[in-house]
């Protein structure tokens, strides 16, 4: 409460959260000369409240109010990030990485990706924190900044990801920035025990695939496609390429995170090829694929 000793005028208040956001607040008169400032905090940590009367701070303003237990504020030093998407990727293909906030208490997460193209960015909650997905459209170096609970970077941030592949957008400015902000809630690591439930055994019908390499290829050039086994339980991915006479020179499979595989292959001659993609013993939907090399 604030006392004004009978002076007439306007009281107004502003609440600043630890991350610098201005929170909405309501000033109400409890009785003549006594006011209450109410706000709903979205972050733990020290909030600063400016209370002004006719534009000047009242005695004691700005007030400091702690929300949550000490040490419970979103502490960026306790947040970690990992995953292939922090190191690199390919244009037009979604890269992803994970952010673990279980040790940090609630805070606002901000992810900024700066590089040669805008990226389509998406974020999903996971039991441990967040999964961030982004699709770069031009090759080059991207700086990925991850901040938590305010203006401070988490450990290792900014990360530098090297993206290869063709440029899929017209030349833009040299530096494009994309960012997302997520208001986090408390996550305790006890939630992670759910991920220990054994996954249903294998189901090849749940594997999906996409990419030009499933239908066409060119002599001496890399063809690629993406296979997503994330919903198919546990098994191994087997790839075979069968050509007219010469064996396929090179077939490589790279796990790009959470059971998604990027497969590339190079063919040596023209003709009809058969491409088999199996999850354990069973063909995935669409397999065997027929690939024509002109």
Curated annotation (Swiss-Prot):
Q: Which GO terms describe its molecular function?
A: actin filament binding
* PROSITE patterns per UniProt: FILAMIN_REPEAT
Keyword Ubl conjugation in the entry? The reply is yes
Report the PTM annotation.
ISGylation prevents ability to interact with the upstream activators of the JNK cascade and inhibits IFNA-induced JNK signaling. Ubiquitination by a SCF-like complex containing ASB2 leads to proteasomal degradation which promotes muscle differentiation.
- List, alphabetically, the Pfam families matched: Filamin
Sites bearing N6-succinyllysine, chain numbering = 210, 216
Where N6-acetyllysine occurs, residue numbers?
A: 268
Iron among keywords: no
The biological process GO terms on file are: actin cytoskeleton organization
Name positions with the PTM Phosphoserine: 61, 157, 173, 184
Instruction: Write out the entry's keywords from A to Z.
Output: Acetylation, Actin-binding, Cytoplasm, Cytoskeleton, Isopeptide bond, Phosphoprotein, Repeat, Ubl conjugation
- Region (Self-association site, tail), start-end ranges: 164-294
Example GO CC term: the record gives: Z disc
Q: Where are the Filamin repeats?
A: 1-67, 71-163, 199-293
Q: Where in the cell is it found?
A: Cytoplasm, Cell cortex; Cytoplasm, Cytoskeleton; Cytoplasm, Myofibril, Sarcomere, Z line
Cross-link named Glycyl lysine isopeptide (Lys-Gly) (interchain with G-Cter in ISG15), sites? 160
Q: Where is this region: Hinge 2?
A: 164-198
Q: What family does the entry list?
A: Belongs to the filamin family.
The subunit field of the Swiss-Prot or TrEMBL record says:
Homodimer. Interacts with FLNA, FLNC, INPPL1, ITGB1A, ITGB1D, ITGB3, ITGB6, MYOT, MYOZ1, PSEN1 and PSEN2. Interacts with MICALL2. Interacts with RFLNA and RFLNB. Interacts with HTLV-I viral p13 protein. Interacts with ASB2; the interaction targets FLNB for proteasomal degradation.
What is the protein's known function? Connects cell membrane constituents to the actin cytoskeleton. May promote orthogonal branching of actin filaments and links actin filaments to membrane glycoproteins. Anchors various transmembrane proteins to the actin cytoskeleton.
Instruction: Name it.
Output: Filamin-B
Record organism:
Oryctolagus cuniculus
């Amino acid at each position: 409460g604030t006392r004004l000793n009978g002076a007439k005028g306007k009281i107004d208040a502003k609440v600043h959260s630890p991350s610098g956001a201005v929170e909405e607040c309501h000033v109400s008169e409890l009785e003549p000369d006594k006011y209450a400032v109410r706000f709903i905090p979205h972050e733990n940590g020290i909030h600063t409240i400016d209370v002004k009367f006719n534009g000047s701070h009242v005695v004691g303003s700005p007030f400091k109010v702690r929300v949550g237990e000490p040490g419970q504020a979103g502490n960026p030093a306790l947040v970690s990030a990992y995953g292939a998407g922090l190191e690199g990727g390919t244009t037009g293909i979604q890269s992803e990485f994970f952010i673990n906030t279980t040790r940090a208490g609630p805070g606002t997460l901000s992810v900024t990706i700066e590089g040669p193209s805008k990226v389509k960015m998406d974020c999903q909650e996971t039991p441990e924190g967040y999964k961030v997905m982004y699709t770069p459209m031009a090759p080059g170096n991207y700086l990925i900044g991850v901040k938590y609970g305010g203006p401070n970077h988490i450990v290792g941030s900014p990360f530098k990801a090297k993206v290869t592949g063709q440029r899929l957008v017209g030349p833009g400015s040299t530096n494009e920035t994309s960012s997302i902000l997520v208001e986090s809630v408390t996550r305790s690591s006890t939630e992670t025990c759910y991920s220990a439930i054994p996954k249903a055994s294998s189901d090849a019908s749940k594997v999906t695939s996409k990419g030009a390499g499933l239908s066409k290829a060119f002599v001496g050039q890399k063809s690629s496609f993406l296979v997503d086994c994330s919903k198919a339980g546990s098994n191994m991915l087997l790839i075979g390429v069968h050509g007219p006479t010469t064996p396929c020179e090179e077939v490589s499979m790279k796990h790009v995170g959470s059971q998604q595989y990027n497969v590339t292959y190079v063919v040596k001659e023209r003709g009809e090829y058969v491409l088999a993609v199996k999850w354990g013993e069973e063909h995935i939907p669409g397999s065997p694929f027929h690939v024509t090399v002109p």
